[in-house]
Amino acid sequence: MVRTEFNKIWSNYFHKEYATLVENGKTAIFEALKILNSEHVALPTYTCHRVLQACLDAGVTPYIVDCGLNLQIDVSKIPIEVDTVIVPHMFGIQADVKSLSGFRVIEDCSQCIGLPDLGKYSDIVIASTGPTKWLNVGEDKEKGGGIIAHNSPFYKESLYNENIAKKLNQMYLEIPNILESRINKASEFINAGIDLIGSDQPNAWLRALYFGSQKRIPYTPLHDRYPGFSCPVVDSYKNKLDWISIFP
């Protein structure tokens, strides 16, 4: 019953035929790359290092791409060799997935539950459900769970945790309330004169970035970890950004 409800809720939510649980978000990306038979994969420099690690584990060639001023992947910088693009909606700011129609697209929705049309323009949706994520089920960091939503009838579920599935089904009902709470919290900062990056765009407010003095930017850009790629926009942001966690 719980399993059937989980598949129905999350496959519909992400505009896919199937939704299954995996061990964590990194595993979800690894599995998505295998489903799509990806070989040359673009991903933004500004995202969690586990996204890059999933690419390396899957044996694909990664292309680390600069971001725009809102810290979402700059579609115009994607190399012609690429067949697949991993698109996270960083900090809950909606990336332009619709513009990627010429590629296979893995949409990372770990930080953006509550935004419109999630999964509508991508081939596969993944989401981490571990600590600090929008869908935080309170499990440990390594095995906190992940969702992969797809259209492949041949994909075999590698993990099913009824406790996590039940929590996610319950959280689905709370999405409007959680989103409203996050937006209200972000509005307090905006009203206090803090200029949050991406505040003029659709935003699910997992975290908010602004120009500040604390220099607590939450991710090391991937091109610093995996040299050979030029990302001047993100480089220009180094040591200039601060961030706020926005929780209900």
Residue spans of the language-model regions?
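A structural motif shared across PLP-dependent enzymes of the aminotransferase-like
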Residues: 1-8
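PLP-dependent aminotransferase class I/II
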Residues: 8-17, 25, 86-87, 152-248
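Short loop-beta-helix segment that forms the pyridoxal 5′-phosphate
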Residues: 8-31, 43-44, 66-67
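Generic structural signal for small/hydrophobic residues in well-ordered secondary structure
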Residues: 10, 28, 41, 59, ...
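Short glycine/proline-enriched coil/turn segments at helix->beta-strand junctions
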Residues: 15-17, 34-40, 79-84, 98-105, ...
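Conserved PLP-anchoring active-site segment centered on the Schiff-base-forming lysine
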Residues: 32-79
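Active-site phosphate-binding strand-loop segment of PLP-dependent enzymes
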Residues: 68-154
